Amino acid sequence: MAELEFEKPVVELRNKIRELKDYTKNSQMDFSEEIRILEDKLENLEEDIYGNMKVWDRVQIARHAERPTTLDYIEHLFTDFFECHGDRLFGDDAAIVGGIAKYKGMPVTVIGHQRGKDTKENIRRNFGMPHPEGYRKALRLMKQAEKFNRPIICFIDTKGAYPGKAAEERGQSEAIARNLFEMAGLTVPVICIVIGEGGSGGALGLGVGDYIHMLENSTYSVITPEGAAAILWKDAGKAKEAAEAMRITAADLKELGVIDEIIPEAKGGAHRNVLKQSENIDLMLRKTFEQLNGISKDELIEKRYEKYMKIGQVSFSNASIWIK
């Protein structure tokens, strides 16, 4: 498993414990006490490092090559998944996957960004950066879900929508804007979960919902820290400083009222235990569906509208203003 710079002391100690256990198996010597001491030390070290992570550490975890993807969670959370392809206008976009499935026996529509696990798959899926046809495919599935009264679950994990010439020629901005407009008025429940990077309009194209949740180490921002640093200071190398200033973590966005709940992760990130992470998401989905139960279609749209109107409202003394 790939290690990140900030967690090297933890990885080194884990390896040392593993080596000592392997040596014990092949020798007559008993190192159980030494192993116990090292395991206690490891527990304290993990608590110290993972309990005091900086924003840049979380950015690295959100981008981890082995971090679970939309298809990983579909495999663990849903049954009878049937993937649908194409936008019926131009083609299919592998950077967004979607289809119908069952969650606890309930028919649902599941849509999400999909990046690759290796170079070949990343190229096929364009590193999880969708073209317009990806967003139009997603919208087609959302309108289908509305027609058949199926709740929608969206998994968000992208650096952003693809900014290439062909994408712009096919109407990238219109496709995202159309999704924002249509998602705001859907008459079925929409639950959005940021599972990795939530990058700019590319994330928002799947991100208008009744409830917005984030995994503990995911990020959500208008631009990458590198991009912000390049614009503000003409130096992408200042990405760490930009990340601190941008308030892009789940804790920051919960405090600001942009998201609803934070889904806990295993120490070191979701990639450490995909099954456990799926269970944590499952708990949040069950809780969210309970909160949505019994809400009429009109009330659903009204609450969704009120939710987004509150974002950006701040108070100075007793005066309330809107940030335009």
From Swiss-Prot:
UniProt keyword list: ATP-binding, Cytoplasm, Fatty acid biosynthesis, Fatty acid metabolism, Lipid biosynthesis, Lipid metabolism, Nucleotide-binding, Transferase
GO terms of biological process kind: fatty acid biosynthetic process; malonyl-CoA biosynthetic process
One GO MF term: carboxyl- or carbamoyltransferase activity
Annotated Gene Ontology cellular component terms: acetyl-CoA carboxylase complex
The keyword Transferase appears for this protein: yes
Location in the cell: Cytoplasm
EC class of the enzyme, as a word: transferase
Pfam families given in the database record: ACCA
Gene from which the chain derives: accA
CoA carboxyltransferase C-terminal domain segment(s): 37-291
Protein name per UniProt: Acetyl-coenzyme A carboxylase carboxyl transferase subunit alpha
EC numbers, comma separated: 2.1.3.15
Lineage of the organism: Bacteria, Bacillati, Bacillota, Bacilli, Bacillales
Catalytic activities: N(6)-carboxybiotinyl-L-lysyl-[protein] + acetyl-CoA = N(6)-biotinyl-L-lysyl-[protein] + malonyl-CoA
Segments traversing the membrane: none
Function: Component of the acetyl coenzyme A carboxylase (ACC) complex. First, biotin carboxylase catalyzes the carboxylation of biotin on its carrier protein (BCCP) and then the CO(2) group is transferred by the carboxyltransferase to acetyl-CoA to form malonyl-CoA.
This protein's pathway: Lipid metabolism; malonyl-CoA biosynthesis; malonyl-CoA from acetyl-CoA: step 1/1
Organism: Bacillus anthracis
Family assignment from sequence similarity: Belongs to the AccA family.
